[in-house]
Amino acid sequence: PFINAAGTYTMLTASLMSQETMDAMEYASKHFVHLTKLQDAVGARIAKLLSAEAAMVTSGAAGAMTVGTAGCITGTDNKKILQLPDLTGCKNEVLVQKTHRYGYDHAVRAVGVKMVEIETEEEFRQKAGPQTAMALFFNDADKRGKIDAAGWVKLGKATGVPTFNDASADALPVERLSQYNKMGFDLVTFSGGKGICGPQ
């Protein structure tokens, strides 16, 4: 055992679950459920709580990044969905600020996309094109980049590129859970195993 004085880092098991959460997990483990219906119901409830268009519980923030990227590539086109990870005929680029590159962007690259690094608003506009599936923003690096969160959203709207904010470690205070959605990000992920204190 050790004392975690660093915070909710994944490699340090992020957070500890409450007894209420443990009791709910034990209760759930004793019942069969229709998973698709459960996912839909939970997503609808979370979306309502956050005033969001939709919500989804995934295997974790990294899983959400993979699923979100895939969704930006395929939309609702079943043919494209079934051909993944083959990106033939699909958008295959994701814009990202150079200062926002980090280990977990592998969850985006795992879909098969090419990360296109940019630094300025002008470069964003120049690089955004018909092959651009998404623009990834790493919330923890907000102060390191030349384009802040609001500017990233504005550029995404202006170029028609969906914006994704990885705010996995930034669930608290609770107002943040709807802040980035209200700001205009198309997709936002939070880690349930960090500030929300769910399973890691």
Segments the model singles out, each with a brief description of its role:
Residues 1-12, 43-55, 62-200:
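Conserved PLP-enzyme active-site core in the AAT-like
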Residues 2-36:
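Glycine-rich phosphate-binding segment of PLP-dependent enzymes
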Residues 37-42:
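A short, well-structured juxtamembrane/interface segment
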